[in-house]
Amino acid sequence: MVKQQKNNMSTKTLIKNCSLVNEGQIRVADVWIEDGLIQKIGQIEDLNDGATVLDGTGKFLFPGIIDGQVHFREPGLTHKGDLYTESKAALAGGVTSFIDMPNTSPNVLSMDILNEKYRIAAEQSLANFGFFLGVNGDNLDEVIKLDTSKLLGVSDDGLYFTKKGNLLADNPETMEKLFANCKSVIAIHSEKEQIVEENENQYREKYGENVPVKFHPLIRSEKACYEATNRAIELANKHHARLHILHLTTEAETHLFRNDIPLKEKNITTEVSVHHLWFSDVDYERLGTLIKWNPAIKTEKDKKGLLKALLDDRIDLVTTDHAPHTLEEKQKPYFQSMSGAPMVQHSLNIMLEFYKQGLISLEKIAEKMCHNPAILYHIEKRGFIREGYFADLTLVDLNTNWTVSKENILYKCGWSPVEGTTFHSSITQTFVNGNLVYNNGLFNEKTRGMALTTTLG
């Protein structure tokens, strides 16, 4: 309950009696927020100076979620989603910061286009924002001339949609040159398109253009993923490059990653997208092309193996790979259906559902969704509940049930693959830079997020 609140633009907020989920511990404390920062954590008396006082009794306070992989579609693809609508959905899901991929229109293959995305986001995004610079064979020489240490990362993700052969995994010479010269995180989509095409041709011979979607994980196969990931790791080790494998999907691949050193010492990291933990190939019969992703949703064994690797620290992050398309685009036949789906509003709820099932701790959720993205991408003063850090915070009620429906889906595309699911936790408040931007279904749309900054720059 909010005891006093003049308006959401108040720069002073006291959150009382909440259970902080932070840095491997849960403890009851108060949090004092002023001028956008966490000023004090501990036992704090109510202050009679016009501050907002929020009673957090019985609720759990997480650092704001940092989603390390989204596709918010702006510029150029805004019939699917845009920085305003998708950041709003993110806030309702407790996500306070995101890093957006380069496969917009135009692709983000130059600093001019990258800077334009930052300009648009500063005007439109309610959450904090960062962007990958796209890299492929066409702009490699320009990229390696840049001081890439100032970037959050470079990536090839999604660029294969505009031109075949754009994936670094299919171009070992390009990948090797990049690894030898790039100081930034290199985040790659790890599938060998040659293997995918061979598999696709086999199924076309049998089914023509009417290949059932259930064969998607056999077309975009374990072999296609494993061989690409294994080769990328070999080259990254050779050049001591900073490699990050996006959206891992197979149990076999998890064994390629280390868990015997802390994240800060790793030069090779990986992530799992939340849908690869939630769905498996048994769901194709029910949901069809709505759960067509690249890389594909795979087997129950893979799903369980990914969760195990997340828990034992071979997998470092949980992301969404939020990729909205219209229902019309998704409901086409297999080969015409677009790959990807919207997830950013529901990712924390899914992970909290795993907590409810006894599969993961709250502390581990905070580690993989808040702390580790900040560490991996060297994001300045975010991802932790610490004095002096930006007040990006998410307050959670673990005892409220609600069902995903068209009425509460906030994505511009208007649908979700988890529609009809009943969750047993809810995000009640979300703070961004000290502003209460989401409060039990209501938004403060007067504020805008900030550009994420890296400590390397």
For the regions a language model picked out, list residue spans one by one.
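Histidine-rich, glycine-flanked metal-binding segment
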Residues: 6-63, 444
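Divalent metal-coordination and catalytic microenvironments
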Residues: 18, 36, 58, 69, ...
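Metal-associated gating/positioning segment near the N- to mid-region
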Residues: 57-124
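Short catalytic-loop micro-motif centered on adjacent basic/acidic residues
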Residues: 99-100, 130-133, 242-247
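A glycine-rich helix N-cap at a beta->alpha junction
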Residues: 119-135
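Histidine/acidic residue-rich metal-binding segments in metalloenzymes
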Residues: 141-318
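His/Asp/Glu-enriched, well-ordered alpha-helical/loop segment
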Residues: 210-231, 235-240, 290, 311-312, ...
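C-terminal cap of metal-dependent C-N hydrolases
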Residues: 333, 387-453
